[in-house]
From Swiss-Prot:
Belongs to the ARTD/PARP family. It comes from the Eukaryota. Its EC number is 2.4.2.-. ADP-ribosylated by PARP14. GO terms for molecular function: ADP-D-ribose binding; enzyme binding; enzyme inhibitor activity; histone binding; NAD+ poly-ADP-ribosyltransferase activity; NAD+-protein-C-terminal glycine ADP-ribosyltransferase activity; nucleotidyltransferase activity; STAT family protein binding. Residues 628-850 form the PARP catalytic domain. Keywords: ADP-ribosylation, Antiviral defense, Cytoplasm, DNA damage, DNA repair, Glycosyltransferase, Immunity, Innate immunity, NAD, Nucleotidyltransferase, Nucleus, Repeat, Transferase. CDD domains: Macro_Af1521_BAL-like, Macro_BAL-like, TCCD_inducible_PARP_like. This is Protein mono-ADP-ribosyltransferase PARP9. It is linked to Overexpressed at significantly higher levels in fatal high-risk diffuse large B-cell lymphomas (DLB-CL) compared to cured low-risk tumors. Overexpression in B-cell lymphoma transfectants may promote malignant B-cell migration. May therefore be involved in promoting B-cell migration and dissemination of high-risk DLB-CL tumors. PANTHER family: PARP/ZINC FINGER CCCH TYPE DOMAIN CONTAINING PROTEIN, PROTEIN MONO-ADP-RIBOSYLTRANSFERASE PARP9. Macro domains 1 and 2 may be involved in the binding to poly(ADP-ribose). Macro domain 2 is required for recruitment to DNA damage sites. Macro domains 1 and 2 are probably dispensable for the interaction with STAT1 and DTX3L and for STAT1 phosphorylation.
Length: 854
C-alpha cells in the first residue's frame, strides 16, 4: 500500500508495462475500487494527466458527459456550479457546450484604423488556429488550464503550455486579476501565449471589476508594445465573459474603450500593427462588433461582409438566424410587429417606420381603414424605403392570447409567400419584446411553423431569416439552441441538413456536439468526490436533503435568499433541526430543484468560508498576532493560515496502525501528515496550561474522527469543529466527538457513509485532561465539583473505560494524520515516500454586503 500518492512525476514504460510513477500507482489502486476510471471512454470519464513540476503536484482533468437537458440546467447555473466544485472539492470546472463548433472558416466582421499605424478588427474564428504573433488566453489565477479557451489552447498546442504555466506559478506565485503571464505557444501557429487573468464578476463591485479588466487589457498592450517589440499582431478574447460571469456587453465595451484610450492620440515606437478581437461564438462576435461600431464608428470593411449565421435546410426551405437590424435587411418581405391602434409603438415598429418613411404609415392606415377586420392578423404594405418589396405587419390584438397570435400570424405570413411568389422573408424575434412571450416559447412556435411549412410545401423555394438585434444575446442563444435541437431531430429523420451541422467532430474522445463538464483537480480523491457529487445532483428527481451544520449559521440575508428561491423557483424548503443534525429538505420539479440545490450549496460554501475566517482570526488573537492592519487587509490577502499535507515514510508505528485500520474493515489508500504551525502553537499553549493544572500528568489521548471530504482541508486549516464532523447522537453533550476505538468508527462509517466509496479519518492528539461522565445537556464541561470555579476538560462515555471523548473547544485537538480509506478490499502496494505539497485555502469571494455570520 502506498502512503505517498500526493505528488509524483508521471512515467510509464510502454515496453515493460511497468508503472514508474507513484501517482500512477495510486491511480491504479483507485482503478480497482472504481472500475469506470479505467475505461477512458465517453460513457464515463476521460482522464488525462499532466506530469508534476516543482511543488504543484499532478493535475487530473476528466470530461464528464451529460445529456442536453442537464446541460441547459447547469448552463443557467454555471457560476454556482463552478463555485461549489471549487470551494467544496478544490476542483476547477467548465461546461463544454454542445453547439460550439460553428463555422470553421475565419471571418472578419469589423475593421478600423485606430492610429495611422495600428488597426483594430473583429473576427469570428478559432483562437487555436488564428494566425497572429501572440494569442491572449483567458486564464485563472493558478494558470490551471482546465476548461474553455484555456483547455482548447493546451489541447491544440501541447501540454508543455500547462507545464510552463505551472513553472511560472511555482517561481512567481499566483497571477492576480489584471496581471499577465507569458509562455511559449507549443504547436500553436502563434509565437507566444499571453495568459491574462480577468476579474470574477461581483455585482456589488462593478467599478472594481471593470477596473481590473481594464488593467488586464493595459497589461497586454504594454507587453506587446513596449516589452516584446517583435510582436506585430495580437488576438484578444472576451476576457472574464465566460465562467467569471462578466456581463458580455460591458466586457466588450470595456475592452474596446480601453484599447482606444490606450492607443489613440499617443505617439509610440512599436512594431504592433494589428489587434484582433476574436471569438468563435456568434453572440460574442456580435457584441465585439457592436461595441467597436459604437466606440470607434463605422467599419471600414465592405458592406457585404457580415457575421456568419446559423443555418439549416429542409427540402427547398433555408432557415437562417442572423444578428442585425431588421430594417436594414435585403429580402422580398420584411415582417413588422405592430400595435393595430398605433404603428409607432414598439422598438421594431419604430425602427421600420423611421427607415421606410411616412409613406408606409399612410398606406398602412389607408389599408387598415378599407380592409381591417378584428380577426385580421397580418396587413400588407409596400416596402417603400426598405430593401424589400413588401412589409407584412403582424397585428397584436390585446383581446387574444399572445402565443396564439404568434402561431397563426406566422402561418399566415408563410402562406402569403406562396400567394405572392415570395422567395425570401425576414422576421424579427416576434413576441419577445413588448408582448413578453418567453424567448424559448417564441423560438419554439416560430420554428414549428417554419418547419411545418417546409414539409407541407416541398416544392416552394424560400429563404427564411430570423433577425436578432445585436445586443439581444439571450434571445440569440435561445433561437440558436432551438435550431441546434431541430437540426439534430431532422438529421435523424433524413431531412436535408447542411454538412456543417452533420459533421462529427471529436474532442478529447467526445463529440464536439456532446455536452460535458470539464473537471480539473490536484488529486484523485477530490476528483472522485466532485464527480460523485455531480452524479448525485443530476440524479435528483423531485426531492433532496442537504445535511450541513452550517445551516445553523445562516443569517437574515441567507434566509431572504431562501425565501426568494421558494418564490421564483416554485420549490418548498424546510429546515429540519434534530440533535446532532441540521438539514434543509427541498421539494419541487427537477429543473427547479437542481437550480435551488446548487444555489444553497454555493451559499453554504460561503458561510463555511466566513466561519473559517472567524476561526482564523480567533487563532491569531489567541497568539497575540492579530492587528488592526491584518483585519483591514484580510480580504486582500491570498492566504491566511497555511498548512502542509505531506506523504509519510513507512514507520513501524504507521504500519501497525494501518493493520489496525484493516482489521476493522477499512482498507488504507493513503496517509498524510498534517503540519500547521499556527494551529500547533495555539494547541501547545493550551496543552502547557493543562499540564500545569494537572501537575504534568498525561493530559492527551491519540483519538480518531471521521470527517466528510469537503471539510478535510478546513480542519487542517483551523482545527476540529463540531460542524465539520459526521453527524452523531450528542448523548454526551453538544461538543466535538472523538473515539479511540477504530472498530466503532468503522461500523459507524459503514452505516452513515454506506454510499461513499472513500472514508476520511483524522488521527489527532486530543487534550482530554480531567474528564467525567457525559450528559446530553452538557454544552460545556461540568465543574470539578458542585460550585467549583474550575471545570473538567472533557466528558466521556464511560469514566472507568472511556472510548468516546467529547471536548468543547477546537483548540484542545490538533490533527496529526489524515487517513484515506475505502470500505472495499484493494490489493496492497509497497510503501514509498514523496515530496511535500503545500496547501492553502481557496480564495473566498465574500458576501455582497456585510457578514451574516455573527
Amino acid at each position: 500500500m502506498d502512503f505517498s500518492m500526493v505528488a509524483g512525476a508521471a512515467a510509464y514504460n510502454e515496453k515493460s508495462g511497468r508503472i514508474t510513477s507513484l501517482s500512477l500507482l495510486f491511480q491504479k489502486v483507485f482503478a480497482q475500487i472504481f472500475p469506470q476510471w479505467r475505461k477512458g471512454n465517453t460513457e464515463e470519464c476521460l482522464p488525462y494527466k499532466c506530469s508534476e513540476t516543482g511543488a504543484l503536484g499532478e493535475n487530473y482533468s476528466w470530461q464528464i458527459p451529460i445529456n442536453h437537458n442537464d446541460f441547459k440546467i447547469l448552463k443557467n447555473n454555471e457560476r454556482q456550479l463552478c463555485e461549489v466544485l471549487q470551494n467544496k472539492f478544490g476542483c476547477i470546472s467548465t461546461l463544454v457546450s454542445p453547439v460550439q463548433e460553428g463555422n470553421s472558416k475565419s471571418l472578419q466582421v469589423f475593421r478600423k484604423m485606430l492610429t495611422p499605424r495600428i488597426e483594430l478588427s473583429v473576427w469570428k474564428d478559432d483562437l487555436t488556429t488564428h494566425a497572429v504573433d501572440a494569442v491572449v488566453n483567458a486564464a485563472n489565477e493558478d494558470l490551471l488550464h482546465g476548461g474553455g479557451l484555456a483547455l482548447a489552447l493546451v489541447k491544440a498546442g501541447g501540454f508543455e503550455i500547462q507545464e510552463e504555466s505551472k513553472q511560472f506559478v511555482a517561481r512567481y506565485g499566483k497571477v492576480s486579476a489584471g496581471e499577465i503571464a507569458v509562455t511559449g505557444a507549443g504547436r500553436l501557429p502563434c509565437k507566444q501565449i499571453i495568459h491574462a487573468v480577468g476579474p470574477r464578476w461581483m455585482e456589488w463591485d462593478k467599478q472594481g471589476c471593470t477596473g481590473k479588466l481594464q488593467r488586464a487589457i493595459v497589461s497586454i498592450l504594454n507587453y506587446v508594445i513596449y516589452k516584446n517589440t517583435h510582436i506585430k499582431t495580437v488576438a484578444i478574447p472576451a476576457l472574464s465573459s465566460g465562467i467569471f460571469q462578466f456581463p458580455l456587453n460591458l466586457c466588450t465595451k470595456t475592452i474596446v474603450e480601453t484599447i482606444r484610450v490606450s492607443l489613440q492620440g499617443k505617439p509610440m515606437m512599436s512594431n504592433l500593427k494589428e489587434i484582433h478581437l476574436v471569438s468563435n461564438e456568434d453572440p460574442t462576435v456580435a457584441a465585439f462588433k457592436a461595441a467597436s461600431e459604437f466606440i470607434l464608428g463605422k467599419s471600414e470593411l465592405g458592406q457585404e461582409t457580415t457575421p456568419s449565421f446559423n443555418a439549416m435546410v429542409v427540402n427547398n426551405l433555408t432557415l437562417q438566424i442572423v444578428q442585425g437590424h431588421i430594417e436594414w435587411q435585403t429580402a422580398d418581405v420584411i415582417v413588422n410587429s405592430v400595435n393595430p391602434h398605433d404603428i409607432t409603438v414598439g422598438p421594431v415598429a419604430k425602427s421600420i417606420l423611421q427607415q421606410a418613411g411616412v409613406e408606409m404609415k399612410s398606406e398602412f392606415l389607408a389599408t387598415k381603414a378599407k380592409q381591417f377586420q378584428r380577426s385580421q392578423l397580418v396587413l400588407v404594405t409596400k416596402g417603400f424605403n426598405l430593401f424589400c418589396k413588401y412589409i407584412y405587419h403582424v397585428l397584436w390584438h390585446s383581446e387574444f392570447p399572445k402565443p396564439q397570435i404568434l402561431k397563426h400570424a406566422m402561418k399566415e405570413c408563410l402562406e402569403k409567400c406562396i400567394e405572392q411568389n415570395i422567395t425570401s422573408i425576414s422576421f424579427p424575434a416576434l413576441g419577445t419584446g413588448n408582448m413578453e412571450i418567453k424567448k424559448e416559447t417564441a423560438a419554439e412556435i416560430l420554428f414549428d411553423e417554419v418547419l411545418t411549412f417546409a414539409k407541407d410545401h416541398v416544392k416552394h423555394q424560400l429563404t427564411v431569416k430570423f433577425v436578432i438585434f445585436p445586443t439581444d444575446l439571450e434571445i440569440y442563444k435561445a433561437f440558436s439552441s432551438e435550431m441546434a435541437k431541430r437540426s439534430k431531430m431532422l438529421s435523424l429523420n433524413n431531412y436535408s441538413v447542411p454538412q456543417s451541422t452533420r459533421e462529427e467532430k471529436r474532442e478529447n474522445g467526445l463529440e464536439a456536439r456532446s455536452p460535458a463538464i470539464n473537471l480539473m483537480g490536484f488529486n484523485v480523491e477530490e476528483m472522485y468526490e466532485a464527480h460523485a457529487w455531480i452524479q448525485r445532483i443530476l440524479s435528483l428527481q423531485n426531492h433532496h436533503i442537504i445535511e450541513n451544520n452550517h445551516i445553523l449559521y445562516l443569517g437574515r440575508k441567507e434566509h431572504d435568499i431562501l425565501s426568494q428561491l421558494q418564490k421564483t423557483s416554485s420549490v418548498s424548503i424546510t429546515e429540519i433541526i434534530s440533535p446532532g443534525r441540521t438539514e434543509l429538505e427541498i421539494e419541487g420539479a427537477r429543473a427547479d430543484l437542481i437550480e435551488v440545490v446548487m444555489n444553497i450549496e454555493d451559499m453554504l460554501c460561503k458561510v463555511q468560508e466566513e466561519m473559517a475566517r472567524k476561526k482564523e482570526r480567533g487563532l491569531w488573537r489567541s497568539l497575540g498576532q492579530w492587528t488592526i492592519q491584518q483585519q483591514k487587509t484580510q480580504d486582500e490577502m491570498k492566504e491566511n493560515i497555511i498548512f502542509l499535507k505531506c506523504p509519510v515514510p513507512p514507520t513501524q508505528e504507521l504500519l501497525d496502525q494501518k493493520k489496525q485500520f484493516e482489521k476493522c474493515g477499512l482498507q488504507v489508500l493513503k496517509v498524510e501528515k498534517i503540519d500547521n504551525e499556527v494551529l500547533m502553537a495555539a494547541f501547545q499553549r493550551k496543552k502547557k496550561m493543562m499540564e500545569e493544572k494537572l501537575h504534568r500528568q498525561p493530559v492527551s489521548h491519540r483519538l480518531f474522527q471521521q470527517v466528510p471530504y469537503q471539510f478535510c482541508n478546513v480542519v487542517c486549516r483551523v482545527g476540529f469543529q463540531r460542524m465539520y464532523s459526521t453527524p452523531c447522537d450528542p448523548k454526551y453533550g453538544a461538543g466535538i466527538y472523538f473515539t479511540k476505538n477504530l472498530k466503532n468508527l468503522a461500523e459507524k462509517a459503514k452505516k452513515i457513509s454506506a454510499a461513499d466509496k472513500l472514508i476520511y479519518v483524522f488521527e489527532a492528539e486530543v487534550l482530554t485532561g480531567f474528564f467525567c461522565q457525559g450528559h446530553p445537556l452538557n454544552i460545556v464541561p461540568p465543574p470539578l465539583s458542585p460550585g467549583a470555579i474550575d471545570g473538567h476538560d472533557s466528558v466521556v462515555d464511560n469514566v472507568s473505560s472511556p472510548e468516546t471523548f467529547v471536548i468543547f473547544s477546537g483548540m484542545q485537538a490538533i490533527p496529526q494524520y489524515l487517513w484515506t480509506c475505502t470500505q472495499e478490499y484493494v490489493q496492497s502496494q509497497d510503501y514509498s515516500s514523496g515530496p511535500m505539497r503545500p496547501f492553502a485555502q481557496h480564495p473566498w469571494r465574500g458576501f455582497a454586503s456585510g457578514s451574516p455570520v455573527d
